[in-house]
């Protein structure tokens, strides 16, 4: 799907700018970029030991709270059509869709915690809770757990990362950088993007944010190019190994059970009823998931690495922390504003990640990336400016 952005700091962090650099010269942040040389040992040692402690009881309490909110919202929604005033109904349904989408995104995050085994010390509990919660949201739990683990193990790697893999110069149809025609065509491309009608950009943003998540699961959209059809539902997909066969079957059965329940409800009630109570909130979950992950891994100042320069900690730092506001940060269980810590130590439970981030900032300095830009500004900038990377080079940055 997308690429990285700009970052300027205070004393300890870079910070996003909105000034576009000429296509003929490298931006200052790219010219001055130096590879981080931290070891994973020194990064881990800067974080208090208790931040790595997991509590199944605490995890289950968060699940209970989120499921309670989802149930209360559902029950409240059953009263909406009883209002005689149509204006109240027209206002109440969107309010339900938005709030239920937010709550269910939080539930999705808790299932994601289970997949990382950060939910509790019990693998059985983690996988049981994760399978139930993700199946409810039409996510093949083990299938995505496996591909997501590979993403964490190879974040920022041009040929091994699993999602948000940037297209190269040749893949977008530009001539080699060294050719005389390249500068002219690149300039033409830049002008074309600048002049592209905002409504066109907005249209493609809506398509990506609403349908990008199921497209990734079904056909590996924005994922690594394996040269053949790839899907999270296919047991022999190149994402998986033969030993994953039964995990994929179990994942598919969970999604099929959820789809069966939705089809049954549609037959007993109506498709319109299922659409109002489930499908529209589900689309809002898709929106939040793609928005969150797009912004975490897409920014002009974040590098991508090839084999010669990549290592785990460098790749883990190729992500951006940002805030969606205290309410959403809380409802999304810190996945937005503590993502750097999560990528460095994915088995750290989310409720300790904020404290860990505090210590990481002090150690990482300018290599800790936080973007305070308004979300709308950040999305627009990344969507229009992060188009491709060069075909060659161990360290590459997004180009417009």
From Swiss-Prot:
Positions occupied by motif Histidine box-2: 148-152
Pathway(s): Lipid metabolism; polyunsaturated fatty acid biosynthesis
Short motif Histidine box-3, span: 339-343
Segments forming a coiled coil: none
GO terms for biological process, alphabetical: unsaturated fatty acid biosynthetic process
Subcellular location: Membrane
Reaction catalysis annotation: (9Z)-octadecenoyl-CoA + 2 Fe(II)-[cytochrome b5] + O2 + 2 H(+) = (9Z,12Z)-octadecadienoyl-CoA + 2 Fe(III)-[cytochrome b5] + 2 H2O; (9Z)-hexadecenoyl-CoA + 2 Fe(II)-[cytochrome b5] + O2 + 2 H(+) = (9Z,12Z)-hexadecadienoyl-CoA + 2 Fe(III)-[cytochrome b5] + 2 H2O
Residue intervals passing through the bilayer: 91-111, 199-219, 245-265, 277-297
Keyword flag Cytoplasm: no
Alphabetically ordered keywords of this record: Fatty acid biosynthesis, Fatty acid metabolism, Lipid biosynthesis, Lipid metabolism, Membrane, Oxidoreductase, Repeat, Transmembrane, Transmembrane helix
Motif interval(s): Histidine box-1: 112-116
Keyword Transmembrane tagged: yes
Membrane topology: Multi-pass membrane protein
EC number, UniProt record: 1.14.19.6
A GO term, aspect molecular function: acyl-CoA (9+3)-desaturase activity
GO cellular component: membrane
InterPro entries: FA_desaturase_dom, Fatty_acid_desaturase
Superkingdom classification of source: Eukaryota
PANTHER family according to UniProt: OMEGA-6 FATTY ACID DESATURASE, CHLOROPLASTIC
Family: Belongs to the fatty acid desaturase type 1 family.
Domain comment in the entry: The histidine box domains may contain the active site and/or be involved in metal ion binding.
Functional description taken from the UniProt entry: Catalyzes the desaturation of oleic acid (Delta(9)-18:1) to linoleic acid (Delta(9), Delta(12)-18:2).
Name of the protein in its database record: Delta(12) fatty acid desaturase
Organism whose genome encodes this protein: Mortierella isabellina
């Amino acid at each position: 799907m997308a690429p990285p952005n700009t970052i300027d700091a205070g004393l300890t962090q870079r910070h996003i700018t909105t000034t576009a650099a000429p296509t003929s010269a490298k931006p200052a942040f790219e010219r001055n970029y130096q590879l981080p040389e931290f070891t994973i040992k020194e990064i881990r040692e800067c974080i208090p030991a208790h931040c790595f402690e997991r509590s199944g009881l605490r995890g289950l309490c968060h699940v209970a709270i989120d499921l309670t909110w989802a149930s209360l919202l559902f029950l409240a929604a059953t009263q909406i059509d009883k209002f005689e005033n149509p204006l109240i109904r027209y206002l109440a349904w969107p309010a339900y869709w938005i709030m239920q989408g937010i709550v269910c995104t939080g539930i999705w995050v808790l299932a994601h915690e289970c997949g990382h085994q950060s939910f509790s010390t019990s693998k059985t509990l983690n996988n049981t809770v994760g399978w139930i919660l993700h199946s409810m949201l039409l996510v093949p739990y083990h299938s995505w757990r496996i591909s997501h683990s590979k993403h964490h193990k190879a974040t920022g790697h041009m040929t091994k990362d699993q999602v948000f893999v940037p297209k190269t110069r040749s893949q977008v149809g530009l001539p080699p950088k060294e050719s005389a025609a390249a500068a002219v065509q690149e300039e033409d491309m830049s002008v074309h993007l600048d002049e592209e009608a905002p409504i066109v950009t907005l249209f493609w943003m809506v398509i990506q944010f609403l349908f990008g998540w199921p497209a990734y699961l079904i056909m590996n959209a924005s994922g690594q190019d394996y040269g053949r059809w790839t899907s999270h539902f296919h047991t022999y997909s190149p994402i998986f190994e033969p030993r994953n066969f039964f995990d994929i079957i179990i994942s598919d059965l969970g999604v099929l059970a959820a789809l069966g329940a939705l089809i049954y409800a549609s037959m007993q009630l109506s498709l319109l009823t299922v659409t109002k109570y489930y499908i529209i909130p589900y689309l809002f979950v898709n929106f939040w998931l793609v928005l969150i992950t797009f912004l975490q891994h897409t920014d002009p100042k974040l590098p991508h690495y090839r084999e010669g320069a990549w290592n785990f900690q460098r790749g883990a730092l190729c992500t951006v922390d940002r805030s969606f506001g205290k309410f959403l940060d809380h409802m999304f269980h810190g996945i937005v504003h503590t993502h750097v810590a999560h990528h460095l130590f994915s088995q750290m439970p989310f409720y300790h990640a904020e404290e860990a981030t505090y210590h990481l900032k002090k150690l990482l300095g300018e290599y800790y990336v936080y973007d305070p830009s308004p979300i709308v500004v950040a999305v627009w900038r990344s969507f229009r400016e992060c188009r491709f990377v060069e075909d060659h080079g161990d360290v590459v940055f997004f180009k417009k």
